[in-house]
């Protein structure tokens, strides 16, 4: 019986070592691919026009008119629904920002490419400074996808085909984060997935909690 236990422990140990080795090699492969793709986006797939536009494109202040437009759209056309929608949109942004910045980034503690010693001299930083925060996940990608998915799901019939523009907008901001040199592609990809899940969750809760106040109700009744 002792030999049986020893054999079982041996098999379990070898299996665990195999899995650890597999995951380590997989991560090393992904990390290498991630860095190579980053260098292509940041260093090869460039254009002077993008060098000027994308640093501005990614700035939150650039999009204040868009946020104000959406708020006015809701307030003017759906006054009884405005407060609940605006508050939920703000909560969506707050959750996505805190999950990305306060949970994921400290836990993974991945250096930004512009702070990575192995990439010194290889990164084109198009911002005044790299920033002291960590890289994974991209809060820009998380926040913009969370907000865009929330808008997409709660205002889809109001916006019509324009709802797709919000997803493209979020993707372009995420891409800009790689282009300007502050995030890896995996950072923005995972941030986009995380933001999508958060936006879907808050939109679902909004519909369940304020079913009679859904922005789409005015149009679906016609």
Feature-to-residue mapping (PLM):
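Membrane-interface junctions
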Residues: 43-47, 59-63, 80, 144, ...
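Small-polar-interrupted transmembrane alpha-helices in polytopic inner-membrane proteins
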Residues: 89-105, 162-176
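Interfacial segments of alpha-helical transmembrane regions
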Residues: 71-100
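Alpha-helical transmembrane spans of integral membrane proteins, capturing the lipid-embedded, hydrophobic core
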Residues: 64, 89-94, 98, 188, ...
């Amino acid at each position: 019986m002792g030999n049986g236990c020893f054999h079982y422990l041996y098999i379990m140990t070898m299996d665990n070592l195999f899995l650890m080795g597999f995951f380590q090699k997989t991560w090393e492969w992904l990390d290498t691919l991630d860095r190579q793709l980053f260098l292509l986006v940041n260093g090869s797939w460039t254009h002077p026009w993008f060098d000027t536009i994308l640093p501005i494109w990614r700035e939150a202040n650039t999009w204040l008119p868009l946020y104000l437009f959406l708020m006015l759209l809701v307030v003017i056309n759906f006054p009884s629904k405005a407060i609940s929608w605006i508050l939920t949109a703000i909560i969506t942004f707050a959750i996505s920002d805190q999950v990305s910045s306060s949970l994921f980034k400290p836990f993974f503690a991945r250096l930004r490419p512009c702070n990575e010693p192995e990439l010194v001299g290889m990164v084109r930083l198009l911002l005044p400074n790299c920033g002291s925060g960590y890289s994974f996940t991209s809060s820009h990608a998380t926040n913009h996808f969370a907000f865009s998915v929330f808008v997409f799901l709660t205002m889809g019939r109001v916006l019509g085909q324009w709802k797709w523009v919000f997803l493209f907008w979020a993707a372009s901001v995420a891409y800009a984060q790689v282009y300007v040199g502050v995030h890896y592609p995996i950072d923005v990809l995972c941030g986009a997935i995380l933001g999508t899940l958060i936006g879907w969750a808050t939109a679902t809760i909004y519909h369940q909690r304020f079913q009679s106040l859904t922005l789409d109700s005015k149009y679906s009744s016609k």
